[in-house]
């Protein structure tokens, strides 16, 4: 086992990788910077982007606000750490490689901020929070160009909206946010 401090470097077959502690999604989370590819192995810190959410006008990326340690401010700070390297690509855990753009980072940042603002209005009603998150996500997707049937997209979002709503509710209970 290797315990890596924030900013630690690891030599992997002559290739230097930098470890950055990126809280927000979870306290234990870290990302790995690969200077050679100018890419981040971002885990869930740069969100989730399913292949079916890649549209002609752009990719839809949704934040991962899952329980139990989601912290919106730390998420935004971690996003800034990732952006500071001026990456060319992000290697997402869910799913695959994405070309980095400031627009994608801004899309993710706006969603985290919107989630943080939406959550208190649904503090005791997970179903209504899920619906609000899905409605918001569909609105963001609309900016990415032509889409499939909205009911099908809503169904594709359901699993993540459930997890994200749980994470937001746990965050509110843990911190007293919005209450």
Model-based region annotation:
Residues 1-23, 27-100:
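Metallo-beta-lactamase
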Residues 68-85, 90, 98-137, 155-156:
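Internal alpha/beta domain cores that form substrate/cofactor-binding pockets in large enzymes
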Residues 2-4, 23-26, 159-162:
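A short catalytic or substrate-binding loop motif that flags glycine-/basic-rich loops and adjacent residues
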Residues 3-9, 54-59, 133-134, 146-147:
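Generic detector of short, locally flexible boundary/turn motifs and exposed helical patches
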Residues 1-2, 9, 38, 121-129:
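Generic structural signal for short, solvent-exposed loop/turn connectors between secondary structure elements
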Residues 121-179:
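C-terminal regulatory/interaction regions
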């Amino acid at each position: 086992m290797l315990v890596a401090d924030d900013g630690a470097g690891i030599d992997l077959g002559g290739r230097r990788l930098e470890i950055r502690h990126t809280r927000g999604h979870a306290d234990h989370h870290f990302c790995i910077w690969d200077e050679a590819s100018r890419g981040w192995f971002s885990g869930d810190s740069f969100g989730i982007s399913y292949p079916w959410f890649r549209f002609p006008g752009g990719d839809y990326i949704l934040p991962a606000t899952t329980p139990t340690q989601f912290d919106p401010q730390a998420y935004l700070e971690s996003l800034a750490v990732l952006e500071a390297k001026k990456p060319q690509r992000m290697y997402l855990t869910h799913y695959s490689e994405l070309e980095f753009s400031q627009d994608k980072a801004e899309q993710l940042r706006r969603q985290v901020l919107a989630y943080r603002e939406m959550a208190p209005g649904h503090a005791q009603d997970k179903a209504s929070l899920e619906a609000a998150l899905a409605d918001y996500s569909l609105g963001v997707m609309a900016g990415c160009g032509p889409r499939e049937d909205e009911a099908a997209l809503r169904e594709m979002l359901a699993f993540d909206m459930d997890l994200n709503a749980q994470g937001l509710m746990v965050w509110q209970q843990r911190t007293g946010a919005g209450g």
